[in-house]
Amino acid sequence: MFTASPMSLSKILARRDWENPGVTQWHRLPAHAPFNSWRDEASARADDNASRKRSLNGDWQFSYYAAPEQVPDSWVTEDCADAVTTPVPSNWQMQGFDTPIYTNVTYPIPVNPPFVPAENPTGCYSLTFEVDEQWLESGQTRIVFDGVNSAFYLWCNGKWMGYSQDSRLPAEFDLSAVLRPGTNRLAVLVLRWCDGSYLEDQDMWRMSGIFRDVSLLHKPHTHIADYHAVTELNADYDRAKLQVEVALAGEQFADCEVTVTLWRDGLSVATASAKPGSAIIDERGNWAERLNVTLPVNDPALWSAETPELYRLTFALRDGQGEILDVEACDVGFRCVEISNGLLKVNGKPLLIRGVNRHEHHPENGQVMDEATMRRDIELMKQHNFNAVRCSHYPNHPLWYTLCDRYGLYVVDEANIETHGMVPMSRLADDPRWLPAMSERVTRMVLRDRNHPSIIIWSLGNESGHGANHDALYRWVKTTDPTRPVQYEGGGANTAATDIVCPMYARVDQDQPFEAVPKWSLKKWIGMPDETRPLILCEYAHAMGNSFGGFAKYWQAFRNHPRLQGGFVWDWVDQALTKKDDNGNAFWAYGGDFGDTPNDRQFCLNGLVFPDRTPHPALFEAQRAQQFFNFTLVSTSPLVIDVHSDYLFRQCDNEQLRWNIARDGEVLASGEVALTIAPQQTQRIEIDAPEFAAAAGEIWLNVDIVQTAATAWSPADHRCAWDQWQLPAPLYIAPPVEGTAKPDLKVKEDVLEVSHQSQRWHFDRASGNLTQWWNNGTATLLAPLNDNFTRAPLDNDIGVSEATRIDPNAWVERWKAAGMYNLTPRLLLCEGEQLAQAVTITTLHAWESNGKALFLSRKVWKIDRAGVLHGDVQVQVANDIPQPARIGLSCQLAQTPQTASWLGLGPDENYPDRKLAARQGRWTLPLDALHTAYIFPTDNGLRCDTRELTFDTHQLQGDFHFSLSRYSQQQLRDTSHHHLLEAEPGCWLNIDAFHMGVGGDDSWSPSVSPEFILQRREMRYAFSWRQD
């Protein structure tokens, strides 16, 4: 038995274990499956709270020091005078101590492994707690820390108990030797930096403390020491075997027996008992402390993310008299994971991974995850058609896997290893001195999590190059758990250490021939000689801010090429932290906002959801692209559609198809049809469509699939899929619009004034701009109607460019270098003409920078007898400048409309390369809802393919994109945080005839596909505008 050390704190610290890669722990207990130590089978079967497991979460005492050497020896037995109360779990940076640091690649400390700075912030935690005398007499008492960042020493009642590092896996210690009846005292010294920090260089906030649960666990003297269950299925998946191994510990285990029982809906499905002593292993014998049983199961209910059917497995340890000593339990899902014929399969079916990467992040609590937030994440993922999650880039809170088992998500469980900032990246992976530390991070993860059916892939870590240590760990995992594939992206995504080709940010059709680690196009990669593995992108579609363009292109490739089996979007949640400004107002902060250096600014804002889990518009794009139903318009007369189910295992029995036929948003007919579709089958539906009278407008068939009843992860009437088609309509000839009076032109010294009844337009003769429009005596413009060729840069436009590190290839730098953000108009022509039935104003502008013309814009404005302003605009773009972000017009309107209505794509923000989720229809939204509150302000709020826009007295018609905003493009460009934006008078109207895509294959290189770049050098557009 371990004997607690009487050494003083200073002597223990003098060894500097935190700078020795060969020391990852002292006296930490071996890894095993999670324990609860129930006293009876009924409680274990019901997963009730166990009386032998006691939470130590709550208020602890805390003292903060700049370095561990500053901590007085006396602290191990008594609190320091400056101690304050702090919650556990928490990150101390979120409690007002020290500084959170956000950095992506660059290490937050000087790179000199295994050494860390002498200034090493240190948190000293203490807690007094009570222990019942019966606990001490009846067995062993352990303490379990589920997560401490980055390393810690533990004392109990003044005696040193051990040391541990690896922030993301449990550390468990036996306290039995030093506990006493009544009051006891824990003291935990936590270091911000240790040599393990060189293995934890993930793209995230760097924070410290006891950030996961702490608990006391009581085990009887003889107890279950580990358990492992493996499901085996026959070729027809209608018979199964559950292979179970249990390990025991304690002096009397040889006299004991374990009963293993499989339960389903409260009933025993299979049971078996065995005494310890495995079969003969080798010439030296067997495992005396282990036992194995096999439970046969006929017609098992199979687990998948679609049908998360679970059984409950209990392990009851009894002594020689039949008394229960210890009970453990876990959920079991019968499923088989394999790679065959180049495809990743579950239960014999090739998967299409609809995945997302997820960091454990909470805006107020940092890296502390509560159950409600975990459940909310899963519910949102399921509602938006995700079926998989990658635990990027470390093992998650233990509860996460249980919830994934029960809700149904496929999981990639990833080891807490990333050395992205090393040069070369593989430096530690090829160093045998670091093998023990890397090994523990992989092996302990597998031993903790291997009973979870949701985990279908193990990952050796992230962005650590490729080295011999990876090859060794790959072999260990494959030997220890041959039931799951292993993936690892480092070294080029297709090394011998991965069963899956798992690149990050490879593009559909474009090669990226980087030296040493090329990224081939996806279509090319799967066709390369001797490459037979499935390809699943471990990261793709970088969702940073206003991004996610081209996502539909990936999904077209996934659906057309079976070995392209999907991928994991980067990433789930914006990693912003809540901070208060000088006035006490909360805002979401990113890198640098805490004075943290180094920092990577807003690069932590890559989420599909905001920090509070409000969706970004990109989330709806993912939902539509990934939907589990596909539709085909078979014929229009009769009106017939096919609905195909992409579900592999689930019979559709909770879905209803609801359809309507609408003309310009007005519903002409509607109906609903119950769906009963077997997996991967099709249901044909004939829709009773009425005869359409000739009338203005387009006719659209809209179909939605809704879940009629609530599920574990969605409310009733949740829409899970949709589609629409434009239907042929009778030819309609619109009658001519008859005006009541012709407009009148007056040529004045400074303006061309056009009048029509209660309206007047002023075209400034010096600038050529429409500077004012009076309607019923009210001025409606605050700023003139002007050409608009730029946008407030998106994150994807900026790329990695910074003030101190310019990337000349970034779109924004190319636009700046060309002078496109510094344009000055030169008027070449401004003339008016009175016609018999109308007035025309013709202008020609050269938009110049440094004396060079970049754009020529010719506008012909016509005001007709109905008082409608018609615009006809021709734009020429200089041949030697980069393609512009937009071609359109902008003005500041005097009114601030409450709402806006439009006929076009909506209701949510959409851009030319991100509009799969947008639907043709008539939409009405409040003005504020037309703005997307990205934390880092950029151009936002566009609605594409608009035919009609109405707000206040204004009505525009044509074929254009638009945005309405309280914020000018200049303010959006100049402001660093959304909370600093100030609403401007009136509102800004942007009318775009052409708008470049947002891109999103990645956010550090130009990624807008060629078809969404404004390649043409001559463009023309027209629209009409009237006021009532």
From Swiss-Prot:
Its EC number is 3.2.1.23. Pfam families: Bgal_small_N (PF02929), Glyco_hydro_2 (PF00703), Glyco_hydro_2_C (PF02836), Glyco_hydro_2_N (PF02837), LacZ_4 (PF16353). Binds 2 magnesium ions per monomer. Binds 1 sodium ion per monomer. Mg(2+) 2 binds at N599. The record marks H359, H393 as: Transition state stabilizer. Coiled coil: none annotated. Substrate binds at N104, D203, E463, E539, Y540, A541, H542, N606, W1004. It is an enzyme of class 3 (hydrolase). The active site is at E463, E539. GO terms for cellular component: beta-galactosidase complex. The keyword Manganese does not apply. SMART domains: Bgal_small_N (SM01038). The keyword Magnesium applies. One of its GO terms (molecular function) is beta-galactosidase activity. NCBIfam families: PRK09525.1. Belongs to the glycosyl hydrolase 2 family. Homotetramer. This is Beta-galactosidase. It comes from Enterobacter sp. (strain 638).
